[in-house]
A protein has these predicted regions:
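Zinc-dependent deaminase catalytic domain
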Residues: 1-155
Length: 155
């Protein structure tokens, strides 16, 4: 496990990198970025988007929301195939020679429960995020796992 602590200047830089990678997303509704750092070195990055080789269109117009509820007008609905930023970062990490053991995740938005489970299972020991997610189950899970969770003030 990594014992090297990040200083405030580097925390800001890595969080800024997460936002820069979020800008690479082709999603229209929400752009999310994730940077995995170990020993103050980036070991993987990810942003939300379609799987490799698929069309880069992350949403579709629909009269139904993500939960199947009918709506009076069409709205943009995220396609179920879209990978979250954390999923992309972790799958890239899995294909590398690096390990997530002892790493820190910098994410533009708090992780959902599924991504929180992936972060924990990958050995991530600390998570920084700026924006809340629509539910707090992911943060609750990370806290239960004794993962350091820090909401970063957006300056």
């Amino acid at each position: 496990m990594s014992t090297k602590r990040l200083n405030s200047k580097h925390i800001h830089a890595h969080m800024k990198s997460a936002f820069n990678y979020a800008d690479c997303s082709t999603a229209e509704k929400l752009k999310v970025g994730c940077v995995l750092v170990k020993d103050d070195r980036i070991i993987s990055i990810g942003y939300n988007g379609m799987p490799p080789g698929w069309s880069n269109t992350c949403e579709t117009l629909s009269f139904f929301n993500e939960f199947g509820k009918q709506l009076p007008t069409q709205v943009l609905v995220t396609k179920p195939e879209v990978l979250h930023a954390e999923e992309n970062a972790i799958t890239k990490l899995a294909r590398s020679t690096e390990s997530g053991e002892g790493a820190t995740a910098f994410i533009t938005h708090a992780p959902c429960l599924s991504c929180a489970k992936l972060l924990y299972s990958s050995g991530i020991v600390e998570v920084y995020y700026v924006h809340e997610y629509r539910d707090t189950a992911g943060i609750y899970f990370l806290n239960q796992c004794k993962i350091g969770v820090n909401q970063f003030a957006d300056n």
